[in-house]
């Protein structure tokens, strides 16, 4: 219901205010919506903190709902950890480490589903891929497009009929996908 949804938003906004954040979920929704409308192929990446002092199960559930709704292409989730000398370290209602870890795992499990769905939508698309290496055991190259950040995102695994040199850009049609990686083949003659 709308009233329940708005209540969840307000609950989550209380945590954002406690963190000193100057944005709210409505602003984030608006910006993401405008970006996706202007650039349909955009990849939106964000990070979240869970287990901030005073965060409730209801606020965690509201965050889960937000993650599900926003369908971020890339998402990292960190658990809050107190840092000496900060206001938050001295706040009451510190969250138990086990709860923080559970909440992090719940968000990442949801994001894994979102990521899988997003990657499935990439099947059939053609991307420019920077080749970074070759996996001999699998007989495939690995690389990244503009969508994958080094050291944090998955790869695009590429089959090719001809040898490719690391550092080379190739045109790849995506043929399959899993939660975090794309699989494709070099397109030698591309016509759209």
Protein language model features and the residues they cover:
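Single conserved hydrophobic/aromatic residue that forms the stacking wall/gate
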Residues: 1-10
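Residue-level recognition of specific faces of alpha-helices
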Residues: 2, 15-18, 63, 74, ...
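Short, contiguous acidic/charged loop-to-helix segments that flank catalytic cores in large enzymes
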Residues: 18-26, 51-57, 94-98, 158-161
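Hydrophobic pocket-lining residues within nucleotide cofactor-binding pockets
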Residues: 11, 50, 80, 134, ...
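Terminal RNA-binding accessory module
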Residues: 90-192
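Conserved C-terminal portion of the radical SAM core fold
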Residues: 8, 26-86, 106-115
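A short acidic, helix-capping loop that chelates divalent metal ions and anchors anionic groups
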Residues: 13-18, 84-91
């Amino acid at each position: 219901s709308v009233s329940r949804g708005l209540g969840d938003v307000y609950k989550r906004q209380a945590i954002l205010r406690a963190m000193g954040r100057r944005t709210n979920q409505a602003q984030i929704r608006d910006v993401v919506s405008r970006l996706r409308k202007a650039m349909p192929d955009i990849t939106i990446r964000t990070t979240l903190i869970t287990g901030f002092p005073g965060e409730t199960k209801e606020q965690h559930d509201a965050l889960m709902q937000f993650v599900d709704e926003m369908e971020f292409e890339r998402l990292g989730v960190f658990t809050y950890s107190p840092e000496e000398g900060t206001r938050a370290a001295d706040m009451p209602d510190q969250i138990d480490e086990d709860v923080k870890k559970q909440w992090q795992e719940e968000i990442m499990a949801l994001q894994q589903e979102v990521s899988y769905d997003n990657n499935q939508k990439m099947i059939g698309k053609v991307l420019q891929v920077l080749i970074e290496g070759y996996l001999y055991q699998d007989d495939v190259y690995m690389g990244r497009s503009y969508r994958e950040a080094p050291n944090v995102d998955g790869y695009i695994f590429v089959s090719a009929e001809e040898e490719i040199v690391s550092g080379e850009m190739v045109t790849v049609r995506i043929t399959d996908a899993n939660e975090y990686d794309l699989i494709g083949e070099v397109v030698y003659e591309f016509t759209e």
